[in-house]
Regions:
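Accessory terminal helices/loops
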Residues: 63-68, 76-255
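Metallo-beta-lactamase
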Residues: 4-107
Length: 255
């Protein structure tokens, strides 16, 4: 027929991702590039995602001046102005996170600190399409940092480190033993749940067959899920860990 389908390759959620322009229909098929929430560019359990290329693809789609955009998430977008606004804002979100991350890397700021500091400007952060359903700006920053600087977490001891359980056992001993750590975790879980989670992980790694430690870990991670707003992927990670903890506890209890 008379319609031309123009396929454009732009790494985004995957390395082989494509979007399609149909000029005669003033239409773009935008696949997973646009999502009606903060783009899922920060999944810590997947291969590399390409934040800068993702943003460029959104800009290129807007440049075709489509009247209809067909995403794989959410309903169709209609009207050139609406499409330009929504795709443009998401491009700005990704560009801002990438720029802040790369600037931080160039200034020698540790990757962990960059992820904790990255934030969107208020006008972008309050936009409905910035809802943190799957990823946070910090998650996306970690993806950008990995693309530019690899998997190392910048702690020299962890390039080729000790066994995690041995390290945890040493830290628990320095803390005064598992009972002392248990008391500290119980106190912290009511004031600083994130720190409590770090410590309960150490307790679990040091004593993975202690039913009391396993129950404490279950209680703390359940509290983390209940008391904070958590994006889906982060919540799934905690739920999967809870399943593991419960299986380990039940195996001990039923012996």
């Amino acid at each position: 027929g008379r319609d031309r389908f123009i396929l454009s390759h732009a790494p985004g959620e995957t390395a082989d991702q494509l979007w399609v322009s149909i000029p005669t229909r003033q239409t773009v098929v935008i696949a997973d590039y646009f999502q009606p929430f903060l783009p899922n560019a920060g999944n810590g359990k997947r291969r590399q995602r390409y934040v800068e290329s993702w943003a460029r693809a959104l800009r290129e789609m807007v440049a075709t001046q489509p009247e209809l955009a067909l995403p794989m998430h959410g309903p169709a977008l209609q009207g050139a102005a609406t499409i330009a606004s929504r795709l443009g804002k998401q491009a700005s979100m990704l560009e801002s996170i990438a720029t802040q991350t790369i600037d931080g890397l160039n200034r020698g700021i540790p990757k962990y600190d960059i992820a904790n500091r990255v934030e969107l400007a208020p006008a972008l952060a309050t936009d409905p399409d910035a809802a943190e359903l799957y990823s946070t700006p910090g998650d996306i920053a970690k993806t950008v940092a990995q693309e530019y600087s690899g998997w190392w977490n910048e702690l020299p001891s962890e390039w080729n480190g000790s066994d995690r359980s041995e390290l945890a056992q040493e830290i628990v001993q320095l803390a005064g033993g598992i009972e002392a750590l248990h008391r500290r975790i119980e106190k912290l879980r009511h004031t600083d749940i994130r720190l409590a989670c770090h410590l309960v992980d150490l307790a679990w790694l040091a004593s993975p067959t202690d039913a009391r430690v396993l129950q404490l870990a279950i209680d703390v991670w359940l509290q983390r899920l209940r008391t904070t707003e958590i994006p889906t992927q982060e919540a799934v990670t905690y739920v999967e860990h809870l399943v593991t903890l419960r299986q380990q506890r039940d195996a001990i209890v039923t012996r």
